Amino acid sequence: MDDMSPRLRAFLSEPIGEKDVAWVDGISRELAINLVTKGFNKAYVLLGQFLLMHKNEAEFQRWIICCCGATECEARQSSTCLKEWCSCFL
């Protein structure tokens, strides 16, 4: 975990609360806009989607790429971020 990005470290430092979706590591400004237009305005809403997919990273990555326009790198980073958050808080 020493190779954790500062953004991931910040996200994992506390409960999600009312954080905007842009707080999730791997979510660029452009992707955040796409997510907000699809109703995923808060990090907890995106986490809910991840949980609905039974924390299956590959399925979540396919979904965020196909439905929201994420790059493979964004998809990988965001799924890792949500998985790590679940490990810390659930």
UniProtKB/Swiss-Prot annotation:
Its main location: nucleus. SMART domains: BAF. Keywords: Cytoplasm, Nucleus. The keyword Manganese does not apply. GO terms for cellular component: cytoplasm; nucleus. InterPro entries: BAF, BAF_prot, BAF_sf. The keyword Cytoplasm applies. It is found in: Nucleus; Cytoplasm. GO terms for molecular function: DNA binding. Homodimer. Heterodimerizes with BANF1. May play a role in BANF1 regulation and influence tissue-specific roles of BANF1. PANTHER family: BARRIER TO AUTOINTEGRATION FACTOR 2, BARRIER-TO-AUTOINTEGRATION FACTOR-LIKE PROTEIN. This is Barrier-to-autointegration factor-like protein. It comes from Mus musculus.
